[in-house]
């Protein structure tokens, strides 16, 4: 068992993480109900956030999606935790020989929910399109309204290690706070430097735009700074049958 620290090493808005087979006729999020949707793992953080957003923002009953799990571009991925999903939810493994990308191209899937695009989309295959496109304006409006910048990954320390070194969680947390400060200063420095050190032509503009909407400290650690995010995630885990009771951060 691990103890989690409120240190969020990865965060991302996820409205743009839904890809659909163009011929499926899916043109809005509500159309996903009753359709066959691929996802690398039902319990992965990305999937939890997307289902939560679909429910909160679009009124979708995500239990009505027909889930197929598997590797995105390479077959064989399986759930890493044991699930206790109600029988009314259709959840099946694609198996060891078919990827989600294969399945959306051959018609077995109507859509894919994934943190990275399927290879067909990356290759410009017109048969696979992003459902919410462009996602950026909707994600920015979502943040302005909810103040949620979805956390993806956190830092964990083994309970046995903490038992040996009780001060370790606070010590590690302080180190990550220091590292975050350095990282944010570097991001600002690069954005405002006279020479572009990022291979992105509008990096400075993107940074300034993010700050104008989210504030200079847009990538925060700690429970108080992320209460809306964590409360939403706990609620999603419970409503999606991943926890037996409603947890609190």
Regions found by a protein language model. Name each.
Residues 59-94, 243-249:
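A local structural motif
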């Amino acid at each position: 068992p691990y103890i989690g620290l409120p240190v969020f090493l990865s965060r991302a808005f996820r409205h743009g993480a839904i890809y659909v087979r163009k011929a499926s006729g899916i043109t809005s999020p509500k159309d996903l109900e009753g359709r066959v949707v691929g996802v690398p793992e039902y319990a992965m953080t990305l999937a939890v956030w997307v289902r939560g957003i679909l429910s909160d923002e679009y009124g979708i009953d995500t239990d009505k999606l027909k889930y197929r799990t598997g590797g995105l571009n390479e077959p064989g991925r399986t759930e890493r935790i044991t699930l206790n999903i109600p029988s009314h939810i259709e959840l099946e493994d694609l198996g060891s020989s078919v990827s989600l990308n294969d399945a959306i191209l051959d018609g077995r899937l109507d859509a894919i929910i994934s943190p990275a695009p399927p290879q067909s989309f990356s290759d410009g295959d017109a048969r696979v399109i992003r459902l919410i496109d462009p996602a950026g304006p909707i994600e920015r409006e979502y943040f302005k309204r909810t103040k949620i910048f979805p956390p993806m990954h956190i830092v964990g320390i083994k309970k046995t290690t903490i038992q040996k070194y009780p001060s370790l969680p606070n010590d590690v947390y302080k180190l990550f706070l220091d590292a975050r400060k350095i990282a944010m200063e570097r991001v600002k420095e690069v954005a405002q430097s006279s020479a572009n050190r990022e291979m992105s032509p509008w990096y400075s503009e993107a940074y300034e735009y993010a700050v104008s909407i989210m504030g200079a400290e847009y990538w925060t650690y700690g429970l108080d700074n992320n209460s809306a995010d964590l409360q939403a995630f706990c609620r999603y885990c419970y409503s999606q049958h991943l926890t037996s009771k409603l947890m609190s951060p």
